[in-house]
Amino acid sequence: NRYKSNVIHWKDFIAQGKDQSMNAEPYDPQHACVVVHTGGTTGSPKGVMLTDDCFNSLAHEFIAQSNLFCRGQKLMNVMPPFIAYGYACGVHMPLVMGLHVVIIPNLDPDKLGALIWKHKPEHMFGVPAHYQQMAASPLLKKKKDLSFIRNYAAGGDSLPLGAELTVNEFLKAHNVEYPLA
């Protein structure tokens, strides 16, 4: 195996960190923890460096909304983790908050309703099209109670008013307390 020299087995990784202190790494406010890729909406696509502080401040903003997010709840991430929205809101933030994360790395839009029903995530971050697909799901239309849904947030694109009304009417008709955020 040509990659053998680059592999660290899990047990070895854990053993190497056993006696390490968190203080071993000095704080650097400009440290970039991740490079994410833009879609090029306002120009050419590019890599953007995001700092530790950027990611952690986002997580702490959500922690401040403790009435909505509770340790042990489930968040389904249908956003690609290589974009800022998918990684920051769909991976880092929920893990910092103690949420269970269900990552769907390659979403088949026709299966979104089945995935929501299977995992019953209280939270989900997606783009407007995801929620339009959810509201059109034949499986979810048959279900009477989707009250497990607490916070489904849309970002990354605009949501036409008519589509937002359709999604929110669907949520209300299925016993969901909060509209799409």
Where are these regions (language model features)?
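Conserved pre-ATP/AMP-binding loop-to-beta segment of ANL
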Residues: 2-8, 14-37, 44, 67-74
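Conserved structural elements of the adenylate-forming
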Residues: 13-16, 20, 29, 48-69, ...
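Conserved S/T- and glycine-rich ATP-binding loop of Class I adenylate-forming
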Residues: 32, 37-41, 75, 81, ...
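Short beta->alpha linker loops
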Residues: 54, 107-108, 129, 158
